[in-house]
Every structure is written in structure tokens, then in C-alpha cells.
Amino acid sequence: LGNKVKALASEYGKPPVNAEPSFHGDGSVTFSGGRPYLKFDEKALLADAGMILSNGTSGKADVSVLDEKKPDLTEKEAKEVNVVLGWYTTEFGIDGSRDKNIEIAAKSIKGVYVKPGESFSYNQSTGARSKENGYQEAPVIINGKLEPGIGGGVCQVSTTLFNAALLSGLEITQRANHYSPIHYAPIGRDATVAEGIIDFAFHND
């Protein structure tokens, strides 16, 4: 019983997790999962559950919650989101470092919930493009030329998101194009980003 209580404390003692979206061919979207952060009185729970077991009866043990942090998107809230407003895809070749940067950036915005009246910032959501965060050196566009730099490829994610937001009818509040045309989106449909300098942002109006 003690090990079970410790396992529960360990599971719920982790940072909260948002409900995960699943997209379907008919244009609908469903969510599942999601978990809050909970800190509870382990000794009190163990004593209460132990008493129930020692009495040979069935029942529910009381849990004294000491601290709680809900995820940004709970499963209950997610059920209100059931339609895909817009989507967009871009293609990329085989480049290990660039592919890794795209993966990290895409994962950092996956499941982000922008409620009505709220705004989204790409730079805030993806965080620092640094080696500490897993980003690798890959080609980036500087003054119209490809140069090696940490985080090359993240602009493809911001461009893909920009087009999805645009097709969804969301208000684009910050967006800048690259110095020169890029291969993965039509001219005028790209969104470059530079940490601390250029951001892509939209508002859910």
C-alpha cells in the first residue's frame, strides 16, 4: 500500500500535462488525457486507506490536497473545441540538424491552447533557440545568404503555423517575411522569426 501511495505521489507530482488533440479526416478534433499537478498528504492518505483495509470494508479514502496546478487545457475544456478551423502543411528534405530543430519547435507548440481573447507568441512558446534546449546548428538566412546558425529550420514551423492561422481567419498581429523567397511556401506566405528581434504572433478574436 505504501508503494502504491508513493507511486501516485510521484505520478501527480510531475508538471501538469495538457489534454492531447487527435485530428480526424472528417474535420473534427477530439482530446484525451490531461493531468494536473497535485501535492497531497501521503501519510494521511496511507492511514485512511490502511484503516479501510484493516476493517475489511470497501470505501473511498480521503485525500488532503496541499497544492494543485491545473494544465492550461483540461479535458473538460478541450471538449468545447471540436472543429478544425484551418490547417497547412509544408515539406522538407533530409537534413539531420535542421530536421531536429523543426521537431523541437513543432513539439513546443503542440497542444498550446489559445483561448478566445488571448494571444499567441511563437518566440515565447518555443523558448530560447539554444544548444541547452536541444537546438542544433543548421543553415539560417542572414542578409539573404545561408549561414550556419543555431536553430536553423524554426522559420519553417512559424511559416506553417502562420498559414494555418491565416486560413483559420485569426488576427495576425506580428509577422515579417524573409529577406529573400524561401522554397517551402509561396512568396508572401512566409513568417520569419529571430529570437528577441522578430516574432510571429496572432490573436484569437
Name each model-derived stretch.
Residues 1-205:
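Surface-exposed, secretory/extracytoplasmic low-complexity segments enriched in Ser/Thr/Asn/Gly/Pro
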